[in-house]
Curated annotation (Swiss-Prot):
Assigned keywords, A-Z: ATP-binding, Cytoplasm, Disulfide bond, Nucleotide-binding, RNA-binding, Transferase, tRNA processing, tRNA-binding
Subcellular location: Cytoplasm
Annotated disulfide bonds: C118-C214
Active-site residues, record numbering mapped to chain: C118, C214
Primary gene name: mnmA
Family listed: Belongs to the MnmA/TRMU family.
Annotated Pfam families: tRNA_Me_trans, tRNA_Me_trans_C, tRNA_Me_trans_M
Identification of the protein by name: tRNA-specific 2-thiouridylase MnmA
InterPro entries assigned to the protein according to its UniProt record, in alphabetical order: MnmA-like, MnmA-like_C, MnmA-like_central, MnmA-like_central_sf, Rossmann-like_a/b/a_fold
Organism encoding this protein: Ehrlichia ruminantium (strain Welgevonden)
Enzyme Commission numbers on file: 2.8.1.13
Site feature: Interaction with tRNA: H143, Q353
Length: 370
């Protein structure tokens, strides 16, 4: 069966038996298979799991990742396959750099993506440091994404399994980080990975995919209320003309484009159009008021060697992880920002989300929507 899972050498011109690979193990099936496959192919595998929170007493965190229960799963996989595994406790750093940022973003009237922030400031930054300190050659993850190196240039592509592609969540990964990163699952489909997990007799073979924000045990609103209750303040719900329609119990309860749960009866459907943290107001209106064909992005991470020309570059952009992509033109601005002109108007351009930029299936980079 292993003949169906051929991968390129992790390090060019270096045999597996001479290559040490740190594998970031979340406790899920993908990273477990990545580690097991490399071990079977003869690589010197070291499994590392970052424990980001404790879910021992909370069954609601099933479907998440990187908790104490997931650490146990990763450790069991390593033990059954016969390679070393280490757990690094990152609960404090995770709280300070991801959870606090998550709450800050919501209280600013934006909608965060903590998974990208976690990859950016913890998983890749700190795991890469651990990889270097161990003297390992590469850091391997179970992400569904493809990377090709040619003549010292790096090209990143969507996964062959388009339903599982995770390139959107990795837009903030830098070129220097990518030089040490390897993604052996990018050329395979999820169903094949589960078959391989069963072939290796991994206990996580049927473990559900992570779908939730790992540290949110119920709803994100409840999490914010528990961790920072003083930020939840009542305010007005207004229409697009400024007329007061009702009151709300905190802008963190809303996101741009939301229709359900607004709490206002109306003949025509109402959507959340704007969140104003300064006035603590929620603006609602018809769906047509959500349509936009221009947006701005900041903190751009540009992976392509070619710079964005001043007269613009025609691209495809994804404004949500589930978005199939829209044709657009990107124009560079000062201070690592850019303007995006969409070919067609798009609903729910949401501040705080990521705008990831592609040339067909090649990821060029991305930035945060202002």
């Amino acid at each position: 069966m292993l003949d169906d899972f051929k991968i390129d050498l992790l390090v060019k011109n270096k045999p597996p038996t001479s290559t040490t690979a740190v594998v970031a193990m979340s406790g899920g099936v993908d990273s477990s298979v990545a580690a097991a496959l490399l071990h079977k192919l003869g690589y010197k595998v070291i499994g590392i799991t970052l424990q980001l929170y404790n879910n021992n007493n909370n069954s609601n965190t099933k479907g998440a990742c990187c908790g104490s229960l997931d650490t146990q799963d990763a450790k069991q996989v390593a033990s059954s396959m016969g390679f070393p595994h280490y757990t690094l406790n990152y609960e404090k750093v995770f709280r300070e750099e991801v959870i606090e940022d998550f709450i800050d973003t919501y209280t600013q009237g934006k909608t965060p993506i903590p998974c990208i922030k976690c990859n950016q400031v913890i998983k890749f930054r700190d795991l890469l440091n651990a990889t270097k300190s161990l003297g390992a050659d590469v850091l391997v993850t179970g992400h569904y994404i493809r990377k090709i190196e040619q003549d010292d240039d790096i090209y990143v592509y969507s996964s062959k399994d388009t339903k599982k592609d995770q390139s959107y969540f990795l837009f903030a990964t830098t070129v220097e980080q990518l030089r040490l990163l390897r993604f052996p699952l990018g050329n395979f489909h999820k169903e094949d990975i589960r078959k391989l997990a069963k072939y290796f007799n991994l206990q996580v073979a049927n473990k559900p995919d992570s779908q939730n924000i790992c540290f949110v045990t119920d709803t994100y609103k409840k999490t914010i209320a528990e961790l920072r209750p003083h930020t939840i303040k009542k305010g007005n719900i207004i229409d697009i003309n400024g007329n007061i329609l009702s009151q709300h119990n905190g802008i963190v309860n809303f996101t741009i484009g939301q229709r359900k749960g607004i709490g206002i009866s109306s003949k025509a459907p109402l959507y959340v159009i704007k969140l104003n943290p300064d006035t603590n107001e929620v603006t609602v209106g018809p769906k047509s008021a959500l349509l936009q064909n221009k947006l701005y992005i900041r903190e751009i991470n540009w992976l392509a060697k070619e710079k964005i020309p001043h007269n613009g570059l025609n691209v495809k952009v994804k404004l949500r992880s589930s978005h199939s992509g829209s044709p657009a033109t990107i124009f560079p601005n000062n201070n690592n920002t850019a303007t995006i002109l969409l070919q067609d108007s798009y609903c729910t351009v949401t501040p705080g989300q990521a705008c990831v930029i592609y040339d067909h299936d090649r990821m060029l980079g991305g930035g945060w929507i202002c």
